[in-house]
Amino acid sequence: EVINVTKVDIISGFLGAGKTTFIKELIEKVFAGEKLVLIENEFGEIGIDGGFLQDAGIEITEMNSGCICCTLVGDFSVALKKVLDEYHPDHVIIEPSGVGKLSDVAAAIENVKEDADIEIEGRITVVDGKKAKMYLDNFGEFFENQVEHASTIVISRTQNMTDEKIEACVHLLREKNDKATIISTPWDQLSGDAIRHALEHGAEIEGLFEHH
């Protein structure tokens, strides 16, 4: 009997960074046709309306156990196990609240691994390119945690930035994380395959995404 491992992607980032838009891109381009569950906690940007998801054949499980980072491993693990038992999804996307620490969310998922066949595929942080420096200065602890623990960093709003600004932003992020794949190409110009490749293969293919 083949055990299907559910892949989990965590999409972190501050409120307004563009997480919801990126998740829509993932759902439409990358995970189309897969059994997918999106878990967002109620403080997230609930910009994805039920209708959109139902059309895509995705069931929404609302987590009302409060902010993942507050309840940490307690309720979150229970909710995640319930989702896995009920839906047996191929993929779970978790959108923690804006100030959630990525390391805490990843630790909570690792905790569930003992009882369930899951693996973390990507720890993705979406960063508003125009605000990265301001976030670092003002919300250092949370923002650094999201950047340092990411396997892929997606810079949003790059279509409105000069190349110098984008380079400065990449440099700033690289100081905190020299291993993650950094995608600075506007997402709508990337194919689903390119995005999937970035999530799965990490830093090997950085050359594809460096913005010229």
Regions found by a protein language model. Give the residues of each.
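Short, flexible, solvent-exposed loop/turn segments with mixed acidic/basic and small polar residues
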Residues: E1-V2, H212
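Nucleotide-state-sensitive switch-loop elements of NTP-binding domains
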Residues: I3-S12, A17-L136
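Alpha-helical segments flanking ligand/cofactor-binding loops in enzyme cores
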Residues: E28, E144-N145
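Conserved beta-strand/loop subsegment of P-loop NTPase cores
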Residues: V37, V92-I93, I118-V127, Q146-T158, ...
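A broadly conserved amphipathic alpha-helix scaffold signal in soluble, globular proteins
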Residues: S103, A107-E110, S151, H171-R174
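Short histidine/acidic/glycine/proline-rich micro-motifs that form metal-
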Residues: A132, Q159-N160
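Charged helix-capping and loop-helix junction motifs
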Residues: N138-E141
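C-terminal accessory "lid"/substrate-recognition subdomains
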Residues: N145, H149, M161-H212
